[in-house]
């Protein structure tokens, strides 16, 4: 994956938002969980900052290996984030037993260039990684994940 300087390469979580992603993923058991990340979206090389998570229902036909957010719920969550005064930063989902990186299915279903796709992998200790979708030609670019100390 080549580096695209148009998009930031770092995502920073508040401690509360990071903990909520891990908690949601852990509570999902064998099924993938998903949601929307909100806060301040970084442009031109600035880090995006996630301060809010909006949990969604996974409506995929095979939730153990896939995730999907119903279009109506996705629109509702985006509107809620915007009404709360936040930018949509990206999306998250879990890989209960899968890899710590995006799968081929994740890449095939990514549709928001410039936004972050966060994965909480649970095979062993929870691992939170983030990848910026750079479009069909460039694919995903891994981002550095940072967590602020305050709650």
Spans of features found by a protein language model:
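Conserved beta-strand-loop surface patch within small alpha/beta domains used
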Residues: 2-88, 97-151
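Histidine-centered divalent metal-coordination motifs
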Residues: 93-95
């Amino acid at each position: 994956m080549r580096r695209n300087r148009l998009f930031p390469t770092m995502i920073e979580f508040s401690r509360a938002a990071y903990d909520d992603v891990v908690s949601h993923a852990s509570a999902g058991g064998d099924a993938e969980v998903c949601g929307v990340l909100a806060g301040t979206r970084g442009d031109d090389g600035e880090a995006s900052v996630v301060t809010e998570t909006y949990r969604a229902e996974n409506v995929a036909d095979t939730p153990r290996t896939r995730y999907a957010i119903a279009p109506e719920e996705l629109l509702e969550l985006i509107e809620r984030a915007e009404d709360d005064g936040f930018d949509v930063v990206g999306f998250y989902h879990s890989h209960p037993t899968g890899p710590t990186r995006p799968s081929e299915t994740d890449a095939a279903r990514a549709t928001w260039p410039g936004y972050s796709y966060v994965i909480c992998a649970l095979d062993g200790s929870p691992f939170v990684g983030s990848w910026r979708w750079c479009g069909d030609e460039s694919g995903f670019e891994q981002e550095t994940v940072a967590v602020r100390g305050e709650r």
